[in-house]
A protein has these predicted regions:
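A short, Lys/Arg-rich alpha-helix, primarily the initiator
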Residues: 1-19
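DNA major-groove recognition helix of helix-turn-helix/homeodomain DNA-binding modules
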Residues: 53-71
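Recognition helix of helix-turn-helix/homeodomain-like DNA-binding domains
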Residues: 33-51
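Helix-turn-helix/homeodomain-like alpha-helical modules used for DNA recognition
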Residues: 2, 68-84
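Conserved hydrophobic/aromatic packing and binding residues within compact polymer-binding modules
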Residues: 14, 28-29, 39-42
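Cell-envelope/extracellular anchoring and linker segments
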Residues: 9, 20, 31, 54, ...
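Short basic helix-loop element that most often maps to the first helix and adjoining turn
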Residues: 13-27, 83
Length: 84
């Protein structure tokens, strides 16, 4: 079992991060191996946790690969990763 902290906290945060990464619901869904309707469903959760832990980790990793970092504290948000 992984002890990795998951920073995905709300559907709004997911939508903001996806847009910041330049992804559509369709492209994020394809990258995660789910239908775009699943992404749309998760984003509609607004101020609630959008999905379960296994998906949270996959979503967070996918967004990181597209240059976006999620954070949960002090409030849920997303930012562009620094270029190396």
């Amino acid at each position: 079992m992984s002890t990795t902290t998951v920073n995905l906290a709300t559907g709004r945060q997911l939508r903001a991060a996806r847009v910041l990464a330049g992804l559509t619901q369709r492209t994020l869904g394809a990258a995660l191996g789910v239908d775009e309707r699943a992404v749309r469903f998760w984003e509609r959760k607004h101020d609630r946790k959008p999905t379960g832990s296994p998906n949270d980790r996959r979503i967070e990793q996918c967004l990181l690969e597209h240059g976006v970092i999620l954070f949960a504290e002090p409030t849920a948000g997303a930012r562009l990763a620094e270029k190396r």
